[in-house]
Amino acid sequence: LRTWLHPNCFAAAPLVAKGCERAFWAAFLVWADTNGGPALFAHLPEMPVDGALAAALRAEAAAQGRRIELVYREERALLDSDLAPADYLEQAVRGKKRKELRRQHARLSEEGKLKLERYDDDRCLATWIDHFLALEAAGWKGAAGSALAAHDATTGLFRDALRGAAERGRLERLSLTLDGRPVAMLANFITPPGAFSYKTAFDERFARFSPGVLLQLENLALLEHDTIAWCDSCAAADHPMIDGLWTERRAIGRYSVAIGGAAKRAAFDRLVGAELSRSPRGIGD
């Protein structure tokens, strides 16, 4: 038994009203006990390890005498600082690398008219989405069959998610264009007090200029956003690009929680104990 997680989503924490966390978990665990079927436990993937929701889960499980284990944990890049963008960049990236990025920006500018575009509304949204999907599909993800445009379902998810966010004033889009053609694009979901950097793509023909990194430098403007305290990169742990720019980390984990009667819970104890003893990071996939 597990909570739902779409392959193109990077957080699976249930959406719970502030102050209702304990009540939610109490109701969920009762439901899981009676509706779990043959499942030995409830598996909760992609959960933030810190915060009120996880704390309430642990507290409610303890109050019910129910075993819960964090069976996997990783840390991914997070932007969380009171510094201004320029000051943050200076402390996050060594001087030699900053000099190289300035050189790449200058060289890319020599290829044509370089322009940054930033939108926080639905202007040109349909065209922007088309350009993003084409840009991503033209790269290695397209060759691997993992681009959003490779499947109707993921294309639809992306279009619907961005349209819905834009309608609610929750979408920010950035593009770096060269002579009007996008060479790097990214989409942020703005969800005060946090944000999520959902998807990014770049033109691999210009890889020597690192357009994706150059666009992420512009994305540091999130630090000056009035309602945003942090931004989750939504990237894999140890990501070779964003880990070098965003120095804070967000712990994400997978919890397993005992459900059902005594027999199920005894079997879960044996299973989770064996798995945790084999893996220092917990149970993998």
Which functions belong to the PLM regions below?
Residues 17, 80-82, 258-260:
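Solvent-exposed residues in well-ordered beta-strands and their adjoining turns
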Residues 29, 91-98, 269-277:
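Short intrinsically disordered coil segments
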Residues 77-82, 114-116, 151-157, 209-213, ...:
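Low-complexity, flexible helical/coil segments
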Residues 1-4, 45-208:
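A conserved beta-strand-loop-helix scaffold within acyl/acetyltransferase catalytic domains
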Residues 1-72, 189-257:
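Acyl-donor binding region in acyl/amide transferases
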Residues 35-36, 112, 136-144, 223, ...:
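A generic secondary-structure signal for well-formed alpha-helical elements
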Residues 149, 172, 226-229, 234-285:
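C-terminal catalytic domain of photolyase/cryptochrome flavoproteins
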